[in-house]
Amino acid sequence: ERLADSPHLAEIREYSMRGMPIYAECGGFMVLCQELQINGKQYPMTGIFPARAEFCPRPQGLGYVEATVEAENPFHPVGALLRGHEFHYSRCVALGELEPTLRLSPGVGMSGPGHRAKGLAAEGPDNLKSRDGLLVRNTFAAYTHLFAPAVPHWAARFAAACRKNA
């Protein structure tokens, strides 16, 4: 409840609207969603992404992942291979159109095991299973925790995005 009442949520949203670079992983991903659901109760978040992060009683993603970048963004070039891990007890439910930028193999990504996001197909490219990474303006968020030494382009591209939008 304290997070939902924080004035910082509005500040984060304003920074995103102005195009400032924001890069979030896991808990940061949840803050950038429209809402967070815990024990059936919903709390408003920044609303940058039209999605709800729902906490579950069991892990929804656990283990090492490799992610292939499928959409251009300020932080990762198309075709880049990202290495990291996922460990999350929440899943992403689409409340509007979502266009994931990463394909995981292995990995669960935004959708928990056996879960389909609202309005998206059970199979094919529109399924959130094994998908991760949302982008709006210069705001990127994913459940995947990068292993930075294995993603050498990341720091330089993040710094360049910051310089460009200073």
Predicted regions: what they are:
Residues F55-A166:
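Amide-donor transfer/coupling interface in amidating biosynthetic enzymes
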